[in-house]
A protein has these predicted regions:
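Metal-ion/cofactor- or nucleotide/acyl-coenzyme-handling active-site neighborhoods
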Residues: 1-262
């Protein structure tokens, strides 16, 4: 795992934006996805410091002061940099790679220390897509309502990603894009009542809409992941005992089991 030493460039100027092809299939093996759920609070980060880690939003706070550099940071909430400016600044300072919306980048004065990649959504499912198989974009094969047309899993982020209304699902697509074959979810509780591990009493709490989308987008997206993406070459495991993701979709493991798998 890399150790953060340099500070970010905080001045304006031309951004060095990298093509997503540059980070496709560049790694293999295990990766941890560190999310913000309360269960991430006790995860022993230093024990697995040599394993690449993808993190998101305020979960970057778990890395502050550790000397551990996240392999990738992703954020799709354009309001996060205004709601939690200190955490967003920390992410831009620490991370080796950052994936953001282009319009998000240009609405902030921060330039990431690491490589910058732009995100974009995968195109909606059309009638012609029903007649062909797309190896990069795994879709819900039902036209139905407009929601079904935007559900899926992207194996190639150059083609766009599918938004499940939880950034952890984007992180899963990123893990596949980069080439990892064993993914361990940390803090993917998806439980608004439990809160985020980094939130403290009396501090500002960013809005949470997980309940609004759990049954309409989040759960159907994980069903696509389990049914059409997970296999011998791409395994996903959940370290959260309080996660709302059903165990029949993503199996749960203990740290002892993780030690045998990585």
């Amino acid at each position: 795992m890399d150790v953060a030493q340099e500070k970010p460039l905080l001045s304006s100027g031309q951004l060095d934006v990298h093509d997503l092809d540059e980070c496709r299939n560049i790694r293999k093996g295990s990766v941890f996805i560190i999310a913000s759920g309360a269960s991430a609070r006790d995860f022993p980060l230093h024990k697995y410091a040599d394993v690449p880690m993808i993190t998101m939003n305020g979960a970057i706070s778990k890395f502050a002061g550790t000397g551990i550099t996240p392999f990738f940071y992703v954020c799709t909430d354009q309001g996060f940099s205004q709601q939690q400016p200190e955490l967003f600044t920390e992410a831009m300072r620490l991370c080796k790679r950052v994936a953001l919306w282009e319009r998000h980048v240009w609405h902030t004065t921060l330039k990431p220390r690491g490589e910058l990649y732009y995100l974009r959504r995968a195109p909606k499912l059309g009638w012609r897509d029903l007649l062909k198989t797309d190896k990069d974009l795994v879709r819900c094969r039902k036209l139905g309502n407009g929601r079904n047309r935007t559900l899926g899993f992207s194996r190639n982020l150059k083609r766009g990603f599918f938004d499940a209304r939880t950034v952890a699902y984007l992180a899963l697509q990123l893990a596949y894009h980069v080439g990892f074959t064993r993914v361990f979810l940390v803090g993917v509780d998806l439980d608004p009542l439990a809160g985020r591990f980094y939130e403290k009493s009396g501090s500002f709490v960013s809005p949470c809409v997980l309940d609004d989308h759990f049954h309409t987008r989040i759960l159907p997206s994980f069903e696509i992941l389990a049914r059409s993406v997970m296999n011998e070459d791409f395994r996903v495991y959940n370290l959260s005992n309080s996660s709302r993701i059903p165990v029949n979709l993503v199996p749960r493991v203990t740290l002892e089991e993780v030690d045998r798998l990585i």
